[in-house]
Amino acid sequence: MALSLESTTSFHMLTVSGSTVTELPGDSNVSLNSSWSGPTDPSSLKDLVATGVIGAVLSAMGVVGMVGNVYTLVVMCRFLRASASMYVYVVNLALADLLYLLSIPFIIATYVTKDWHFGDVGCRVLFSLDFLTMHASIFTLTIMSSERYAAVLRPLDTVQRSKGYRKLLVLGTWLLALLLTLPMMLAIQLVRRGSKSLCLPAWGPRAHRTYLTLLFGTSIVGPGLVIGLLYVRLARAYWLSQQASFKQTRRLPNPRVLYLILGIVLLFWACFLPFWLWQLLAQYHEAMPLTPETARIVNYLTTCLTYGNSCINPFLYTLLTKNYREYLRGRQRSLGSSCHSPGSPGSFLPSRVHLQQDSGRSLSSSSQQATETLMLSPVPRNGALL
């Protein structure tokens, strides 16, 4: 869960996903401290106000995000019969966001009551859900970026990929995300500390620090390097294609689909990078020079950012699919006009289609698949983009 019940002492913090408990000096076991009891003090009016505000904000985010993602799923169901890859991936992203948002009521209930009421199974499921959906989302975005890269630079390779192949890729992202989340799911357990119930990991602080560092690499660093490299190469390819396209057709390609995918990726990083830095800071710095009030504010902000990502995403998904449909219609019109003018500067595109027809593939049943993966602009005949 993204929301952490922060410590009000300077003791070393052991972070469980988003829940923070304290490790007392001289005690090898994690034990309850003022992370639970502090905010319940009657004199802590600020804490009560802060709890009410964060509860209201998260509730609003949950409602908006759930409505938006359900709407996205309903709309996408109309296009799933098409062979276009984007619809499969957008459905996967919306499902991940929806699952993540479903944990909001449990977070609010836990923070208001200052206790855990959902048992050992709730610990294992809810405290692993954010890692699961986080990885499923970023892995899907990485695949989407690689698909767009292939559609621009290797169109024939992408045409040969069926919708079933892409569904297997999506299933693979969830299986890999589940594999990375499995250690947390197995290690977390319900522990009684006095009159309170806490979800704590069975392993020690060092193992937990190592595990969180690994997940930071798999959810932020690794995908970031891959996506960054893909977009650097795409930027170079678009720069070259713009030069050639201007000379040949006086038209520049329209990379709006790529821009929107990149926007979703950047939003993911903007929302989850502060969360991860906050978590790792607690792991690698035993005593942070922050007052309890400051730590609480930082925790609230990082929490709202992570859930804000799933709240804003549906609006970007709508823009993405709208521009994607326009792009497909534009490519179909371009193919239709080019087929009547084989000697025109844009005749490279239908020649690719003829290659597929000569190889025995029928494009009549998958014209949308073919137009999706053809290049956004004519390729120079000297192969400069390859």
Curated annotation (Swiss-Prot):
GO MF term list: urotensin II receptor activity
Glycan attachment positions: N29, N33
Swiss-Prot/TrEMBL GO biological process terms: negative regulation of blood pressure; negative regulation of glomerular filtration; negative regulation of urine volume; neuropeptide signaling pathway; positive regulation of angiogenesis; positive regulation of blood pressure; positive regulation of cell growth; positive regulation of circadian sleep/wake cycle, REM sleep
Topological domain ranges for the Cytoplasmic compartment: 78-87, 147-167, 233-258, 322-386
Domain of life (superkingdom): Eukaryota
Location relative to the cell: Cell membrane
Positions in the Extracellular compartment: 1-54, 114-124, 187-209, 285-299
GO cellular-component term (any): early endosome
UniProt keyword Zinc-finger, yes or no: no
CDD domains, A to Z: 7tmA_UII-R
Membrane-spanning residues: 55-77, 88-113, 125-146, 168-186, 210-232, 259-284, 300-321
UniProtKB keywords: Cell membrane, Disulfide bond, G-protein coupled receptor, Glycoprotein, Membrane, Receptor, Transducer, Transmembrane, Transmembrane helix
Annotated disulfide bonds: C123-C199
Tissue specificity note: Preferentially expressed in neural and sensory tissues.
UniProt membrane topology term: Multi-pass membrane protein
Coiled coil regions, renumbered to chain: none
Family, similarity comment: Belongs to the G-protein coupled receptor 1 family.
PANTHER family found in the cross-reference section: G-PROTEIN COUPLED RECEPTOR, UROTENSIN-2 RECEPTOR
Function: High affinity receptor for urotensin-2 and urotensin-2B. The activity of this receptor is mediated by a G-protein that activate a phosphatidylinositol-calcium second messenger system.
Protein name in UniProt: Urotensin-2 receptor
Organism: Rattus norvegicus (Rat)
